[in-house]
Structure formats: structure tokens, C-alpha cells
Amino acid sequence: MILFQYDFKIEFYGASSDIRYQKPKLVVETKQGAPIINIVISNEYSLASSLQCKKARLQLFNMPLNFNKSLKQGDIARIYYKKFAHEGDLDYRFIMIGYLGAPVDFDFENGDFICQYEVYLLSSDTFFDKKLDTKNYIGRSIEEAINLAFPGQAIIGMSSQDRKQIISESFYASTLREFIEKLIGKYVHLIFVDVGELDFKVDAKFVFINFDRPVGQRVYKRLEDFALLFIPQREVRFVGKSTINFWNATLFFTDKIKVGDGVEFIDRHGGVIRAIVQEIGASLSNVGDCTLKLRLYDESNILWMG
């Protein structure tokens, strides 16, 4: 049974750094289950697993035969949703904006025809070959180094101690790729490329997360407030001498939870579990349920080194 009737609006624009004054090439808006649209949001590893990047896959069913001719690789897709069919245009909420990959078409024996597109936050892998203005980071704090390499794009989810750590050994990087490779693992546990708050351009934010120390006065969002579908399931990993707990949670889709957020929930024994969102995925459809899947890193984990 579908509890919410989600609708979607997808606007397609020509490639541009700023689309606020552009008229979309095409607009696809669902009403009463037509056209059928499936959206899958997932995480893609890049730079040899050094960082995760949010991406989406669009599937549009039975569009006009010339639909793909109006779109090309590198065009921009802007995606919105609303939960109830009776809501107006002003009730649409922003999901993400990104660059289209090459279109893929599928024909099925029953006559259905699907146009499929990948939607990326970064224009291409060459993004990481961008030359840095500052190349030598010895003597700078981790926070200062990150903000120099990613001006206006960094969200730092690290403790004050980790932020203030001074780089005291060789740290020379001429490109973003080299910077990330030197940073990840040694100074930062996870770098996640997420969508920003802006909807008039492709606004990628780089989220830097460390798991082993508390981050100041973290605000915890109660998962029960977001229509949690079942009690999160624990997953145990063994890393060296450490036992690491993760939790997998599924809830109705919301745009209010992001990677790096603190969340809490009641486990099956009545205890309060606090965790950090490590990964997010979503399955969205205007003819089915829309769910958000979270992978959570338990804050009680203790990493034993050596």
C-alpha cells in the first residue's frame, strides 16, 4: 500500500555554470502516476575509493520518441519532489541538481520504452586535476589546508582537535587529486561529495568527516520523527582489535538528513543509540514507495590502533 503519492518535477537545461536566468529545454512533471519516473540515489567511489560522491539515476518511461534528441551529455538536470498530489507548485522540494551522463535507451517486450540517465555532481574525472593556488601545506592546520583547497565548498565535520592539527611533514600537492590522496586516511576518515543548498547551479559540497572524536555540540535528529519503517539493524565489523558497529536504517524519503549528520534512535532493547550518517541511498517512484536508506556509524565505537 502506498502511503504517500509522490510527484516529481525534472527540469533539463543546457550546460551552463548558472541557470537561474535560463528557460529549461524540457520539463517533465508527473501527475496521477504519469509519466512513470524512477529515481535511484546512490554513492559512487572515486579516486580509487578515496572519496564517495552522490549520484542519481533517472528512468523515464514511455517518453516521446524524440525526447533524447533534445538532450546531450553535460546538460543539467534539476530534480524536485512533493509528497502529496494535492499540493501546489510552491510545495515542491529540491532533491539535487547535476550533469547528465550519456543517455541509455531500453525497449521491453511489453512495449515499454525507458530513457535512462546518470546524474553527476562533478562534470568529469578531470575535475580532480584542477591546479591548486597553494601547493605546500606544511605548517598549516588541517582546517586551513582544506579551506584553501576547497574555498567555499568545504563542510568540516571534525573535532576541534582534529581541525587544529598542524601538518608537520611533507605535504605538497599541485592538484586536488594529490591533495585528497595525501589527506584521506591519515588526517580524514571520509570525504563525501554531496549536493549543496543552491538549485540554480551544480553546487557540490565536500564533506570531511572523522568518526573517532566528538564534534562539539552535535545536534542529533531523532529517526522516529522521520517515519522510521523498522528498528535499525546492527552490522558488526572487526578492524584489527576493534569491534565496529554500524546500523542500517530505512525510512520514508526526506531531504532533511545528510551525510555527516548526527542521528539517534531507540534500539530493540530500549536503549538510545547515537550515530553519524556515513552513507545515504534512496529509491523514489511516483507509482511506488519512496524510501531513504541510511548506513550509520555508531558513536560508541572505539578504534584501537596497533
Regions found by a protein language model. Give the residues of each.
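Short beta-strand-centered interaction patches in the first periplasmic/extracellular domains
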Residues: 107-128, 156-234
